């Protein structure tokens, strides 16, 4: 069941769902808007074949911090954005993230991202700027909408994977065959 603003506020008030910082205007009718955090990761294009099962991900990305002037994203570029907010999920709630329609209408796209029950950390989301012209982004822009769903009871194994507790933009892990 998709949780309403009232149900989300109740989970937060009870300390079962933690979102920090939480801005009052972030809680929407059926979800929470999140803001662009302090860092961004750009791909490093070398023209060589990447092997995500063998390569060190840090060789293929460069991480930068936002300044007051923002950061210019080149046209047709994939980036990793991190949320300003740190989230701690209950063991009986999962979430689905998508871009806010206002940012999508400018030309950004992102694959829907699942947040597992029991996850905690800042969210790192891959976003694609689809226009040929560069665009300037700023820290603090509301870019992500997160909707919450109750699971049928608490999950037996809450999330405890490689991204648990992540802070800052987090690069992908190596893929397993």
From Swiss-Prot:
Spell out the molecular function terms from Gene Ontology. dCTP deaminase activity; nucleotide binding
Query: EC?
Result: 3.5.4.13
Q: Which Gene3D superfamilies match?
A: 2.70.40.10
Q: Where is the active site?
A: 126
GO terms, biological process: dUMP biosynthetic process; dUTP biosynthetic process
Query: CDD domains from the entry?
Result: trimeric_dUTPase (cd07557)
Q: What stretch or stretches form a coiled coil here?
A: none
Q: Name one Pfam family in it.
A: DCD
- Family per similarity comment: Belongs to the dCTP deaminase family.
Q: How does it assemble?
A: Homotrimer.
Protein name, entry field: dCTP deaminase
Q: What is the lineage of its organism?
A: Archaea, Thermoproteota, Candidatus Korarchaeia, Candidatus Korarchaeales, Candidatus Korarchaeaceae
Give me the gene this protein comes from: dcd
